[in-house]
């Protein structure tokens, strides 16, 4: 599959620094407190990354990468030196073709020693995805346990539904600062969903339709920062469909979702210009899994059989899943 998804607002929206409910005060100076080396010199290693492809090979990554240094062999967050002060802010890099592009927004700067590096990023794609993704960032503190922190869904207030998320890739790998580069092989930890709605006669969609949106249930509430495992697959994500320029279909640019529970509930909600709301519901035949994209093509049945709010039929339902 061609690479999909572009990266327009990522730096501001997902990787714009870290916050904490109980922030620890910064520690000044390179004190070498990284598990035994005792070296005051701070090292900023070269950073490279690859990302998995549909055939399970790795290709050089372009996009945004964040690096979270932990104490060796643990999920305990060590932190990162910024201007010789130990802070909870992770390293932040823009990558092109696997290599750092220009000066990093925030370089990894650490004393010589062994660390457990956690990597999260969003690759840049040639084709667009949903333009308004959002996530809740983890709360980072020096010495905190990253296995108790999460990337979470952001609620679509005042509604009870949630926004789609960014395309997130992840890796964990030990590193010896001072003797080696940082080189991460990233794997995608979210699923993609694309919905296409057509008229049953392959003609122009009815001018009586004001809008369409999709609700997809059984979506994980959050991903563990340390393990990338999905948690609490009970939430509903919503997104709109957009009318094509020729008026023959409504669809969405691929949305990214945290993995779902088995047989998530799909709802297509159509609002007519007279205010009537029509809803179609059906469970998907399989869960939305990390590193896959489901394209769902629907052919509308008769949505005008009832004058009042009610259901409608789908004449054709086609699910096509692929690795991304």
Language-model regions, residue ranges each:
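Hydrophilic extracytoplasmic domains
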Residues: 48, 261-324
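Bacterial Sec-dependent N-terminal signal peptides
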Residues: 4-55, 291, 307-324
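Beta-strand-rich extracellular modules
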Residues: 120-124, 198, 271-275
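Structural motif
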Residues: 48-60, 196-206
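Short, low-hydrophobicity acidic/polar segments
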Residues: 74-188
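Solvent-exposed, conformationally flexible loop/turn segments
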Residues: 174-179, 245-248, 287-293
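Short helix-loop boundary/capping segments
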Residues: 192-253
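Compositionally biased low-complexity segments at domain edges in trafficked proteins
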Residues: 148-204, 294-324
């Amino acid at each position: 599959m061609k690479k999909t998804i572009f990266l327009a607002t990522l730096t501001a929206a997902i990787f714009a620094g870290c916050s904490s409910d109980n922030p620890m005060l910064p520690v000044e100076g390179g004190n070498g407190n990284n598990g035994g080396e005792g070296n005051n010199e701070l090292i900023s290693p070269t950073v490279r990354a690859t990302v998995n492809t549909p055939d399970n090979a790795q290709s050089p990554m372009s996009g945004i990468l964040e690096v979270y240094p932990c104490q060796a062999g643990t999920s305990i967050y060590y932190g990162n030196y910024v201007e010789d002060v130990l802070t909870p802010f992770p390293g932040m890099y823009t990558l092109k073709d696997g290599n750092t592009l220009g000066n990093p927004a925030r370089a990894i700067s650490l004393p010589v020693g062994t660390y457990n590096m956690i990597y999260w990023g969003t690759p840049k794609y040639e084709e667009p995805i949903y333009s308004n993704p959002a996530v809740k960032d983890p709360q980072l503190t020096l010495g905190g346990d990253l296995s108790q922190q999460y990337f979470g869904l952001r609620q679509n207030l005042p509604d009870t539904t949630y926004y789609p998320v960014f395309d997130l890739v992840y890796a964990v790998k030990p590193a010896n600062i001072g003797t080696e580069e940082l080189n991460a092989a990233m794997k995608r930890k979210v699923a993609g969903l694309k919905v296409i709605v057509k008229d049953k006669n392959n003609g122009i969609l009815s001018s009586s339709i004001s809008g369409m949106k999709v609700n997809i249930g059984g979506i994980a509430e959050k991903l563990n920062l340390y393990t990338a495992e999905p948690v609490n697959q009970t939430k509903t994500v919503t997104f709109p469909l957009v009318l094509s320029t020729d008026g023959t279909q409504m669809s969405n640019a691929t949305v990214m979702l945290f993995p779902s529970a088995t047989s998530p509930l799909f709802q297509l909600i159509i609002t007519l210009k007279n205010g009537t709301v029509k809803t179609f519901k059906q469970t998907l035949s399989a869960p939305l899994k990390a590193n896959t994209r489901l394209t769902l093509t629907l052919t509308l049945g008769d949505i005008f059989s009832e004058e009042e709010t009610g259901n409608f039929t789908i004449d054709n339902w086609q699910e096509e899943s692929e690795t991304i």
